[in-house]
Amino acid sequence: MKTLVELYDDCPIENVLAADTFRPERTVYLCPSEVAQDKEKQKRLQEYFRHRGMDMETVFLDTSLFHTDKVIRQLQRVVETYPDCAIDIAGGSDAALFAAGYFCRETDIPVFTHSRNLILTL
């Protein structure tokens, strides 16, 4: 996996745990517009990864995490751009999790979830 797709979560650990574990070349965050436009918040995430010794590209894509159709459309665009991706469904809204699970089932894109003690590939 070169590209990790994260469903942005208000809980910071959910936004970094998978990337810190798998160390992909890039992480794409599907996030609300206030995060996609917040350069300071993006900078803090990038600084965290650099501090952890990761030279990883981060991409922030605006989407409504409460509308399944919008999440699915954004995931389609991500897969077109980064066909080597896998999707982490450990964070995000219930609607985004549903959309990502449905999308992965329909497209055969790898999907996983995790906790601090366990990683499950679905």
Q: Over which residues does each language-model region extend?
A:
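Long, low-complexity, Lys/Arg-enriched
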Residues: 1-85, 98-122
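Periplasmic-binding protein-like
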Residues: 86-90
